[in-house]
């Protein structure tokens, strides 16, 4: 048996820019369980839900990195799987990660974490704000007034982003570090 040592000539690959996220590159794979194990309270989970209404299509096409049209915030990791808070018409819905992931088009998920603030005092203040927002949401699950606008308030107060920021704009922001961007599947779920 002979060993093949020659290689085809190719151009070197350069690192893709931060906003080059909707490419045809090979995506990493993960299960819902491994994604759940790496999720922390305060993380943002991005998905693409097929557009059903004109408001669903907003920000879905056009600029690079606009593949995501929905995001949720991890608000609890104490149970079997993380609980995701997602903005809905009139209030915030709470659902398990597996149900949130099951809605995605093509299985693509991005998990992003807030970048640490530059000073210890700023880190404490942001962490305290995030905890207050999440505690108010979870402590008043049946108070619709408290549940209204949670995601927009969280994005504004904790991430310092505009209340009306699109998921694509949040993904490209410098306030988040991308922990996972790939395809997530649930082996227990029929295809």
Where are these regions (language model features)?
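N-terminal accessory segments that precede or flank the first globular/catalytic domain
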Residues: 2-79
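Activation targets extended, charge/polar-rich intrinsically disordered C-terminal tails
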Residues: 5-12, 142-191
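Generic N-terminal initiation segments characterized by hydrophobic and/or small/turn-forming residues
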Residues: 7, 24-26, 32, 94, ...
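Short linear motifs in intrinsically disordered/low-complexity regions
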Residues: 15, 20-23, 44, 77, ...
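Short secondary-structure transition/capping segments
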Residues: 38, 124-128, 133, 185-190
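Glycine-rich catalytic cores of cysteine/serine-nucleophile enzymes that process amide/ester linkages
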Residues: 47-113, 140-149
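Active-site nucleophile-His-acid catalytic modules used for acyl/amide transfer and hydrolysis
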Residues: 54-57, 107-168
């Amino acid at each position: 048996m002979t060993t093949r040592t020659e290689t085809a000539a190719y151009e070197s690959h350069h690192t893709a820019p931060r906003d080059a996220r909707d490419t045809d590159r090979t995506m990493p794979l993960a299960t819902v369980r491994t994604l759940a194990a790496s999720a922390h309270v305060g993380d943002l989970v991005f998905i693409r839900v097929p557009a059903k209404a004109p408001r669903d299509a907003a920000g879905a096409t056009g600029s690079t990195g606009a593949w995501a049209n929905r995001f949720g915030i991890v608000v609890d990791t104490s149970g079997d799987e993380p609980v995701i808070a997602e903005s809905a018409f009139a209030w915030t819905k709470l659902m398990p990660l597996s149900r949130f992931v099951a809605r995605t088009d093509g299985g693509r998920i991005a998990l992003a974490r807030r970048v640490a603030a530059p000073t210890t005092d700023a880190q404490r203040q942001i962490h305290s704000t995030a905890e207050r927002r999440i505690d108010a949401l979870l402590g008043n699950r049946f108070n619709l007034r408290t549940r209204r606008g949670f995601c927009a308030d969280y994005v504004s107060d904790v991430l310092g982003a505009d209340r009306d920021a699109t998921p694509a704009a949040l993904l490209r922001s410098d306030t988040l570090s991308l922990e996972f961007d790939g395809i997530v599947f649930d082996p227990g779920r029929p295809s």
